[in-house]
């Protein structure tokens, strides 16, 4: 496994309202399946495509910090929560990835983790095509939640077909691949 700070950095964002065992399981399985050097949880500030979280951002951040305390190779990035404090402006993934890229440099491989359901809606995300220049995308599948793109003629189908790779591809470039991986159903 890669050393923290140099290997592939996994990024798992979400409202975490509340954080639950499926989030933690996804992180653990992604780290193992994809050989991630580190996995960073990123609590959302103000999600643009979901209802506002019931729990305050500071509480959601504290939940994630507490859950990950003492777990080697796992970290928490408070950036979205801090940026959203005192504003209702949406927290866009592309802005978070731009910040991560500045923080970790142009060469460190970054991997944004998504579930198959979120990936299927990627075209609705703000500046979605720019995500590929900033990070790889790992798409978690489980029974009943497989990837439903690639066979059609949408822009996302074309991106999926052109960028599909494997875990072995992640360390070879800082961004640009789409890597499906299976997780167990809970």
Please name every model-derived segment.
Residues 1-186:
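Nucleotidyltransferase catalytic core that binds NTPs
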């Amino acid at each position: 496994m890669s050393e923290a700070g140099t290997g592939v950095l996994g990024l798992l964002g979400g409202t975490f309202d509340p954080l639950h065992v499926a989030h933690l399981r996804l992180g653990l399985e992604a780290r193992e399946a994809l050989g991630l050097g580190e996995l960073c949880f990123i609590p959302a500030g103000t999600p643009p495509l979901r209802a506002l979280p019931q729990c305050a951002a500071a509480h959601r951040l504290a939940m994630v910090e507490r859950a990950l305390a003492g777990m080697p190779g796992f970290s928490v990035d408070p950036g979205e929560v801090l940026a959203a404090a005192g504003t209702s402006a949406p927290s866009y993934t592309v802005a978070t990835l731009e910040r991560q890229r500045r923080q970790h440099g142009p060469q460190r491989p970054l991997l944004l983790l998504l579930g198959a359901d979120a990936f299927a809606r990627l075209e609705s995300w703000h500046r979605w095509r720019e995500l590929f220049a900033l990070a790889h995308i790992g798409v978690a599948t489980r029974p009943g939640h497989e990837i439903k793109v690639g066979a059609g003629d949408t822009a996302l189908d074309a991106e999926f077909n052109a960028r599909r790779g494997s875990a072995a591809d992640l360390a070879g470039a800082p961004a640009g691949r789409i890597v499906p991986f299976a997780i167990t159903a809970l």
